[in-house]
Curated annotation (Swiss-Prot):
Lineage, broadest ranks: Bacteria, Bacillati, Actinomycetota, Actinomycetes, Mycobacteriales
Principal localisation: cytoplasm
A biological-process GO annotation: regulation of DNA-templated transcription
Transmembrane segments: none
Keywords: 4Fe-4S, Cytoplasm, Disulfide bond, DNA-binding, Iron, Iron-sulfur, Metal-binding, Transcription, Transcription regulation
Residue span(s) of domain 4Fe-4S Wbl-type: 33-86
GO molecular function: 4 iron, 4 sulfur cluster binding; dinitrosyl-iron complex binding; DNA binding; metal ion binding
Species of origin: Mycobacterium tuberculosis (strain ATCC 25618 / H37Rv)
Cellular component, GO annotation: cytoplasm
Induction: Weakly expressed in exponential phase, more induced upon entry into stationary phase. 3-fold induced by streptomycin and pH 4.5, 4-fold by ethanol. Slightly induced during entry into hypoxia, by cAMP, in macrophage infection and 5-fold induced by NO. Repressed by WhiB4.
Requisite cofactors: [4Fe-4S] cluster
Details of cofactor binding: Binds 1 [4Fe-4S] cluster per subunit. Contains 1 [2Fe-2S] cluster after reconstitution of overexpressed protein from E.coli. Following nitrosylation of the [4Fe-4S] cluster binds 1 [4Fe-8(NO)] cluster per subunit.
Family: Belongs to the WhiB family.
Protein name per UniProt: Probable transcriptional regulator WhiB6
Pfam short name (any one): Whib
């Protein structure tokens, strides 16, 4: 299935017009370009990867997945998630906000008796 976007002003949108994406059965949302080259998003992400990520039609769902996935790190929905520290908490807060403001509510993680 091929998706075309009207905005032609940016290189990013020009890229997406030519990307052949498969629709997932679960969400009926196209897979992002990150599925074709995952190492580019998990190592040190470059500016082009961030730009592609921020224009992805799956961005809001990706933001929710990042917040709900334990141990998520790297580039998710255009936001870099560090391994640990305050920067990680800040990035996850940004992703939660992106997801929820765009119609993808984030499930709160339950605290187990062992981790409490």
């Amino acid at each position: 299935m091929r998706y075309a976007f009207a905005a032609e002003a940016t290189t990013c949108n020009a890229f997406w017009r030519n990307v052949d994406m498969t629709v997932t059965a679960l969400y009926e949302v196209p897979l992002g370009v990150c599925t074709q080259d995952p190492d580019r998003w998990t190592t040190t992400p470059d500016d082009e990867a961030k730009t592609l990520c921020r224009a992805c039609p799956r961005r809001w769902l990706c933001a929710r997945d990042a917040v709900e996935s334990a141990g998520a790190e790297g580039l998710w929905a255009g936001v870099v998630i560090p391994e640990s520290g305050r920067a990680r908490a800040f990035a996850l807060g940004q992703l939660r906000s992106l997801a929820e403001r765009n119609g993808y509510p984030v499930r709160d993680h339950r605290v187990s008796a062992q981790s409490a």
